[in-house]
Each structure stands twice: as C-alpha cells, then as structure tokens.
Design a protein with these regions (language model features):
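Ribonuclease/tRNase effector modules and their secretory precursors
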Residues: 1-92
Length: 92
C-alpha cells in the first residue's frame, strides 16, 4: 500500500545537512525492495518500525511511525556494513 511520507522539517534539514539524505526519498525505499520489522526496543507511546531498503544502490535504514494515514519518518541513515549483512537475509 502506497502511503504518503511526512516528517518534521527541522529533523529533515538536519539529516539532509549531516548525512546527505532527504526524508522525501523514503518513498523510493518503500517503492523498491525493502524489509520492515517492529521497533520493540522500548515503549515509544506509538508503534514504530524499522525499514531497510535501497536508495541509489546503497542500503538505508529508516525509523518511522504510521500517523494520519501516512508514514512519518523519524530518522534515516546509511546502513553500516555489519547491519547491511544482517538485513540482506530479509532482502534476498
């Protein structure tokens, strides 16, 4: 199911400046081959998910929550080598 992408503009700007990643590009990750797990590391007061997928031939990891029929992006970063190896099991 295609859901719109939303995000906090200030977090977006910080991530774009520090990591060169644009939260708006999360739609490309969800449109391609990706895997999602529930983020149960602690109680956030809302459901959170961790998704790994491909963006311009590099693996990225997103943390997001469903909100108002959209995916609200909380964070986005490039996967580390060990992390990428773990996610590849799910992504094939």
């Amino acid at each position: 199911m295609k859901m719109p992408i939303t995000f906090d503009p200030a977090k977006h700007d910080i991530t774009l400046r520090k990591r060169g990643l644009d939260f708006a590009d999360a739609a490309k990750v969800f449109a391609g081959r990706h895997a999602t797990i529930s983020d149960v590391r602690r109680d956030y007061g809302e459901p959170r998910y961790i998704t790994a997928g491909w963006l311009s031939e590099r693996m990225v990891v997103l943390v997001w929550t469903p909100r108002d029929n959209a995916r609200r992006i909380i964070s986005m970063r490039y996967a580390h080598a060990k992390e990428e190896a773990r996610w590849r099991k799910f992504l094939g």
